[in-house]
From Swiss-Prot:
The modification Arginine amide is found at residue 34. Belongs to the short scorpion toxin superfamily. Chloride channel inhibitor family. It comes from Leiurus hebraeus (Hebrew deathstalker scorpion). SUPFAM superfamilies: Scorpion toxin-like. This is Toxin GaTx1.
């Protein structure tokens, strides 16, 4: 769900919000856990 930037310290939170609560950054991509 969207890109992940290592320079953004809030990326993990943004990724989780993008996924609706559960999501993690794997390299340059934000992936949602189902």
């Amino acid at each position: 769900c969207g890109p992940c930037f290592t320079t953004d310290h809030q990326m993990e939170q943004k990724c989780a919000e993008c996924c609706g609560g559960i999501g993690k950054c794997y390299g340059p991509q934000c992936l949602c856990n189902r």
